[in-house]
């Protein structure tokens, strides 16, 4: 089984009406220590910056990606797709998702990674999901942003302190 972050469900008024939002409880912030932060990167630059974190057990990564020429883009960890956004079909990892402002062509993610699980909170918690961490043992890419000429507008990496 997986241990999940404690989260808080709230209602938020959006341009499309009231929506249910799921975010980690605020106490989780006290476990996170900022390590690195960058802005306006190409996917290749972002991938290079993240190399130093390939072997980390517990990380938090906050990022915003902007699709300009790509119709799909995402973020993998050793071949495992953490984010796969298809703008044409409005899907995120194969499930329907439409951003609040589809014309912005941006997607923000707050990703918590530990030894056994990955939890992702999209666009401030409007969409969230978790998965078992299952890296491809033959994959050496580590963290890998993908998509035709995407911009990684913001990339922040945090260490996450264990509570055990």
Regions found by a protein language model. Give the residues of each.
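Beta-rich accessory regions
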Residues: 1-164
